[in-house]
């Protein structure tokens, strides 16, 4: 007797079904750009509204924006140091806010109401291209910080405390962007898939705890990425001991 394949409701879930934009020989994931632009627009609108008619004693959105500013400033100062953190505050703040808004926007915004010819909108950070691009930017910032501060002496850290460490230090430079990108991508994609499967199976109450846990995890992932980015930049700026 032939065995028939079992049809499961979550078998219809697709991973990697994309809307492609072609520019010459280059293919871009169109839905990632669209969702990124929407989320950036929401963030800009939030900032513009919160900074309109600013008061000496902040209330409402202004109070929240000042809290975020203090939080990001303290994060950058703790990891980079008092002397250099101001130069890197915009970069660290942009990373944190974009990742945070992308993660939460992917979970809270009903993207399915926006129909596309192919694929569907979602969190930009659930696409490996987005997380790899940000991780490479962090690596470039690390090298720029070190070379601009120390010049060629920056490369001394690869042979300290002993030249035997050279191959391990080189491997470490490759593992930094890999760990940054895959940690963020894996957590956000796994959360989206888990919620998607539960919505198919039990569409009412059961997915809510998973969604709340996903929001908490998403915030933590934004914090981890920004903290590690600031730490790497601080590592490039300071003298090795």
UniProtKB/Swiss-Prot annotation:
GO cellular component: plasma membrane-derived thylakoid membrane; proton-transporting ATP synthase complex
SUPFAM superfamilies xrefs: F1F0 ATP synthase subunit A (SSF81336)
Tagged with keyword Amino-acid biosynthesis: no
Single annotated GO MF: proton-transporting ATP synthase activity, rotational mechanism
Chief location bin: membrane
InterPro entries (alphabetical): ATP_syn_F0_a_bact/chloroplast, ATP_synth_F0_asu, ATP_synth_F0_asu_AS, F0_ATP_A_sf
Keywords noted in UniProt: ATP synthesis, CF(0), Hydrogen ion transport, Ion transport, Membrane, Thylakoid, Transmembrane, Transmembrane helix, Transport
Database matches in CDD domains: ATP-synt_Fo_a_6 (cd00310)
Annotated compartments: Cellular thylakoid membrane
Record flagged with keyword Nuclease: no
UniProt xrefs under Pfam families: ATP-synt_A (PF00119)
Membrane topology: Multi-pass membrane protein
Superkingdom to which the source organism belongs: Bacteria
TM helices/strands, residue ranges: 30-50, 89-109, 128-148, 193-213, 214-234
Subunit structure: F-type ATPases have 2 components, CF(1) - the catalytic core - and CF(0) - the membrane proton channel. CF(1) has five subunits: alpha(3), beta(3), gamma(1), delta(1), epsilon(1). CF(0) has four main subunits: a, b, b' and c.
Described purpose of this protein according to its UniProt entry: Key component of the proton channel; it plays a direct role in the translocation of protons across the membrane.
Matching HAMAP family: ATP_synth_a_bact
Family the entry assigns: Belongs to the ATPase A chain family.
NCBIfam families, A to Z: ATP_synt_6_or_A (TIGR01131)
Alphabetized PANTHER family for the sequence: ATP SYNTHASE SUBUNIT A, CHLOROPLASTIC (PTHR42823:SF3)
Protein name, entry field: ATP synthase subunit a
Gene this protein is translated from: atpB
